[in-house]
Amino acid sequence: MFNTNRVRIAMQKTGRLSSESIKLLTCCGIKINLKQQKLIAFAENMPIDVMLVRDDDIPGLVMDGVVDLGIVGENVLQEELLHRISQNLENSYITLRRLDFGICRLSLAIPINTPYVDITSLKNFRIATSYPHLLKKYLDSKNIVFKSCMLNGSVEVAPRAGLADAICDLVSTGATLEANGLREVQVVFRSHACLICKTGNINFAKKEVINKLMTRIKGVIKARESKYIMLHAPVNKLEEVISLLHGAEKPTILKLAGDDHRVAMHMVSSETLFWETMEKLKSLGASSILVLPIEKMME
């Protein structure tokens, strides 16, 4: 019998989101020994258990209340949701937050020599996909009649194998499509990884753990999106320098020893600092510009 006060998190055992999910928990300070041959791993320093499962099992485990939380791609989540709605199965969940990894899109692609004007060009096509419900929802909204060919893997080879006229599959860079003589013609669904939670009663002890975890996740993601900036700036150009940098809070201004015309400025910037911005800072007389990564951040 498992401890009902320990929070159970389902995450992908192997695949696209696995390493990033593990990295997120590690950055949140959760000490856990994750061995791929085990179904469940236990955190040493927090009452958290991690279930390592197939990604398409995660939404169902959360919706059925088997686990408390799940880290899953929105594409997998929405596909399972549509399936459960069609079958009158339990389908309730709460999205706690979108995460900053697992970014991809579900797209329609056709052989490079297939004519294409707009979405109506796919009328009566046989389309291979691992996401039949998302595909149907999209094409139904466009009043496109089509035939679905369900494949659980290697969808991109379906046209060459004579199984389909087009495919609907996940795309990150498009390199796989190009390697198989395909071109992307329409985005069906854009996806990130997300953290989801079961609905229904969650006891106080678990809520405290979940709230603590959410605070840490927010801090980790905020830190990834931010940089710590240090520079020296002319006093008479200070406002212009500050206007170039979008800070989480107002900057810290310090006097420089033996220099009444320049100050040191420290701040957390909430935007990526591009070379162009650094060059503008330099043109305003800023010097000793340092841009540092932030490991952890709590506002």
Swiss-Prot record:
The keyword ATP-binding applies. Pathway: Amino-acid biosynthesis; L-histidine biosynthesis; L-histidine from 5-phospho-alpha-D-ribose 1-diphosphate: step 1/9. Pfam families: HisG, HisG_C. One of its GO terms (molecular function) is ATP phosphoribosyltransferase activity. It comes from the Bacteria. One of its GO terms (cellular component) is cytoplasm. InterPro entries: ATP-PRT_HisG_long, ATP_PRibTrfase_cat, ATP_PRibTrfase_CS, ATP_PRibTrfase_HisG, HisG_C, N-reg_PII-like_a/b, N-reg_PII/ATP_PRibTrfase_C. GO terms for biological process: L-histidine biosynthetic process. It is found in: Cytoplasm. PROSITE patterns: ATP_P_PHORIBOSYLTR. The keyword Amino-acid biosynthesis applies. Catalyzes the condensation of ATP and 5-phosphoribose 1-diphosphate to form N'-(5'-phosphoribosyl)-ATP (PR-ATP). Has a crucial role in the pathway because the rate of histidine biosynthesis seems to be controlled primarily by regulation of HisG enzymatic activity. Belongs to the ATP phosphoribosyltransferase family. Long subfamily. This is ATP phosphoribosyltransferase. The gene is hisG.
